[in-house]
Amino acid sequence: MGLKAHFRGSLPAGLIHLYTFPGGYCGMSAIENGLINVCLLVRQDTFQSASQPSPASVNQFIVWMGQQNPALGKWLSGAERIDESWLSISQIPFVTKQVVVNDILMAGDSAGLIAPVAGDGMGMALQAGRMASDVLGLYLTHQISAVDVRQRYSQLWWHTFGFRLRLSRVLQAFMLRPNWLTPGLMVMNAVPALGRLLVTHTRDTQLVRP
């Protein structure tokens, strides 16, 4: 499940700060009006067990999360939550989807949901919208058929995002499993170039054309 809230606190701009804890991870970034956007993803079973013996409680889970990662707990205790409560979402489908459904070209999360730790979902949605516009432009100018529209968009979408989605799911599997994450981080610390390589292959590092 995912949780999100806005805070007021100290956090350097221009960077995404990532904290891990057993069964999940939490990301922070500075946004407009001097606020900090805090989002986290956690396994449903981890959330439930951390909220016991009382009914599942977000606030109780946040306390538990801070105890698992002292650096994260220290930041949260020194920051002011602006939102009245945490926004939550569950049953997040990180599964393969159809890019064209009933002759409708899908974009954004409707086409494929990338793991937050590894991707720029909004950027992908904008890029897919541009791709759909380009393909439909060819159809409207009678250069390709309706069948070609479906085939071209699907092929272009998977060529652009397919590997990125698969790699993001592997990375997220490591992030949600402590027994995998610790040795994985040790390898990345020993080989810094590996981290840069992962960033390059999970995001579009090229400028979007006008």
Predicted stretch roles:
Residues 12, 23-26, 30, 36, ...:
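Short capping/connector residues at structural and topological boundaries
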Residues 12, 74-75, 163-164:
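Short, structured loop/turn "capping" segments at alpha-beta junctions
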Residues 19-21, 25, 89, 199-205:
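A general structural signal for short secondary-structure boundary/capping elements
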